[in-house]
A protein has these predicted regions:
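Amphipathic alpha-helical assembly/interaction segments
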Residues: 1-125
Length: 125
């Protein structure tokens, strides 16, 4: 866990394991709202797999037996988040502004997670 602020009243902690879990959960909930087209069904399945994989691999990275294994798992996390972004971009959301905003928010989160995982890899070398 990384400590984000040191205010007197509240200390905010960033738990990356929780953040990756929420990203996967939010992607799953997003898929449930998509129009049921053939392409959305397939893209949705891929999105659920890749977003879940980044969360699972982050948990595995935290249990790594070696630094090499840790870095490898984090690289997989980064790859899976980038893949999730592709599937998010490919989903056809029709005219729903709410779903469009949710899609944009998830894409932004995937960009942030990609940067975080990239920084972890860079600092671990």
């Amino acid at each position: 866990m990384l400590k984000a602020s040191n205010s007197k009243q509240t200390s905010k902690f960033y738990d990356l394991e929780e953040r990756t879990y929420k990203f996967a959960k939010n992607c799953r909930n997003f898929v449930k709202k998509l129009p049921r087209t053939i392409s959305n069904i397939e893209y949705g399945k891929q999105l659920i797999r890749s977003s879940g994989s980044q969360a699972a691999n982050y948990i595995e990275a935290n249990e790594a037996l070696s630094k090499k294994d840790f870095v490898h798992r984090i690289k997989i996390c980064k790859k899976e988040v980038k893949e999730s972004r592709l599937w998010l971009r490919l989903c056809n959301i029709s005219n729903s502004n709410t779903t469009r905003k949710e899609q944009k928010k998830l894409i932004e989160e995937s960009i942030e997670l990609t940067k975080i995982f990239g920084a972890i890899v860079g600092k671990s070398k």
